[in-house]
């Protein structure tokens, strides 16, 4: 089976790797990914992980800025005469002309149990919304945003303290396995695409800076879900500085001691030896385990207490201009 792979970030790597395994029945004849972009604090221009892997295997790579407006790339894709296009976190919408090219269609690996969490950030929003289960879906792509007919699905539990990055790693691996199963069954004609029930659709929009700001008026559980979903990017104000809250503890697993004072939302109300600090919220108190001060490396909350940067009575606050 001749495959063109569309994918860019780390999440796409396991799917590309499994197609490239020795004795694989699949022949990857091309990779399409996003252009090299500045990354990290140094803003060094780096290639996508999928590009590095493809080039190591001698696979041709295309990196159009706008696929639908690049006639040379479109012509090259047509000339490859692929049986199927596989799309895993590519980062662009495939135009109708591309969707119609491969004989068996375009197969997408999406990190949710569609029709739930259509969109760009399904992993993070599932955690932020307090879901206890998610999964991966392979679907036959159409012109809509994650609206194609479902081929196969696999469920995974979301653990109470699991972060978005941790869950993404699991889903990427499970998605790769499901992709192989999908392609094998598709070639044999053993799959019946099932249309999605649009009435049950929910959405996972692209993340914005405001999504990372912590509002201590919210309940402890909601804040914990937000912190782990978007880790390590959630932030709050502390004495005029912007501080990142990297890790918290699940309230149901680490309830505050009965003698802990209630405090006002955002106030550091107690210490947990070897664990962190308790912060009052709109409903209950939340145990904060790890944080990061401006210009510093991530530290345990206990180290911040020992260093005098954090103490009982201090108050986290919403920043006016995140």
Curated annotation (Swiss-Prot):
Key words, A-Z: Protein biosynthesis, Transferase
Reaction catalysed by this enzyme: L-methionyl-tRNA(fMet) + (6R)-10-formyltetrahydrofolate = N-formyl-L-methionyl-tRNA(fMet) + (6S)-5,6,7,8-tetrahydrofolate + H(+)
Keyword Transferase: yes
Coiled coil spans: none
A cellular component term, taken from the record's GO annotations: cytosol
Record-linked PROSITE patterns: GART (PS00373)
GO MF, one example: methionyl-tRNA formyltransferase activity
EC numbers: 2.1.2.9
Domain of life (superkingdom): Bacteria
InterPro entries, per database record: Fmt (IPR005794), Formyl_trans_C (IPR005793), Formyl_transf_N (IPR002376), Formyl_transf_N_sf (IPR036477), Formyl_transferase-like_C_sf (IPR011034), GART_AS (IPR001555), Met-tRNA-FMT_C (IPR044135), Met-tRNA-FMT_N (IPR041711)
Enzyme class: transferase
Amino-acid positions noted as binding (6S)-5,6,7,8-tetrahydrofolate in the UniProt annotation, renumbered to this chain: 112-115
Function: Attaches a formyl group to the free amino group of methionyl-tRNA(fMet). The formyl group appears to play a dual role in the initiator identity of N-formylmethionyl-tRNA by promoting its recognition by IF2 and preventing the misappropriation of this tRNA by the elongation apparatus.
Family: Belongs to the Fmt family.
Designated name of the protein: Methionyl-tRNA formyltransferase
Organism: Synechococcus sp. (strain JA-3-3Ab)
Species lineage: Bacteria, Bacillati, Cyanobacteriota, Cyanophyceae, Synechococcales
Gene: fmt
